[in-house]
Amino acid sequence: FEIEDAWQIIETGQPMPARNADSHDVLGTFQIVASRREMRRTPTSSDDLIELLQDRHRIMMAARPDRNPGMFKMQNNHAGDSHFVDCMLVRGTLRKGYEFYQALEHPFAKALFMLFMVSEVHPFNDGNGRISRIMMNAELVAADQSKIIIPTVFREDYLNALRRLTRKGD
């Protein structure tokens, strides 16, 4: 979407007829990120992390029942040469990841860890990038820090950085 199109969808609450499902993705994402209360919620336990991820994903993907909103993937997924966590290991990996997250103190460190963990696990069939950025920004909002917005023009730089972390471990 162009910015103007997304703004119209948000302002009117009406999807664009030619892109109904995509429009609802915009509305669902906006519903989460526009809520100060929702964006101040951060996980307090590994169970809470799982519930928070599933709740936010359910809202974000509500218009796409074929993508199983709020349900963790049932098949392994990959993007190009990046293969993500096995579908049978998603919950356990998130639980273990929460232990590392819990040890972090600085909000920025927590935000980046949350972004990377969710992106690396890729727990859902679709919407993993958006949900990882929502989780990252929730950490920042909860600490009264500025949100991080990744403009489309920097999309490749952002994805290349994630790929490098995934593949080279640095």
Across the structure, where does each feature detected by a protein language model lie?
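FIC/Doc superfamily catalytic core
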Residues: 1-170
